[in-house]
């Protein structure tokens, strides 16, 4: 995907300054390594709630990242990462069907286990640099999130990041939307691998 197209969709190579993103939340969004490991370190009880996993049409800016010629269905997984019974992250993963079978075979059987628990222990997995966005209420990911968490409706903007993971010829796009719980949850556990 071209950098120009990504910018038009709101995705940039750095998190834009926004006074509504305080330093603690910015630290969560821009931190390196496994977000799962950082969330585990910052909570007494961590769990994954799988919301959806099936073949679905990716959003316009996703299918181009995946290298698809059109909006053919892709394996889509949506989960909430929950810290101390508070939703902290809405995660949205898309991968081409044939890549899911060949390069990411564990994905279909993951259930309510964290994806990060598999990605960061596999030496064959490479991660591209992050792209960041400020998701406004009209963004398709916000609309999907609203169906799950209607309480997010009055929140004017949610920061998000996404990254492409590569394994063999397979490309997987993982997008993480950072929810208000992380405004006050201390970010620690940087440098851990999970």
From Swiss-Prot:
Domain of life: Bacteria
Cysteines paired by S-S bonds: none
Family, similarity comment: Belongs to the UbiC family.
Protein name in UniProt: Probable chorismate pyruvate-lyase
GO CC terms, sorted: cytosol
Catalyzed reactions per annotation: chorismate = 4-hydroxybenzoate + pyruvate
Cross-referenced PANTHER family: CHORISMATE PYRUVATE-LYASE
Known pathway: Cofactor biosynthesis; ubiquinone biosynthesis
Its biological purpose: Removes the pyruvyl group from chorismate, with concomitant aromatization of the ring, to provide 4-hydroxybenzoate (4HB) for the ubiquinone pathway.
EC number: 4.1.3.40
Molecular function, one GO term: chorismate lyase activity
InterPro entries the UniProt entry points to: Chorismate--pyruvate_lyase, Chorismate_lyase_/UTRA_dom_sf
HAMAP family: UbiC
Coiled-coil residue windows: none
Binding site for substrate: 77, 115, 176
Location within or outside the cell: Cytoplasm
Keywords tagged on the record: Cytoplasm, Lyase, Pyruvate, Ubiquinone biosynthesis
Gene Ontology biological process terms from the UniProt entry: pyruvate biosynthetic process; ubiquinone biosynthetic process
Main location (coarse class): cytoplasm
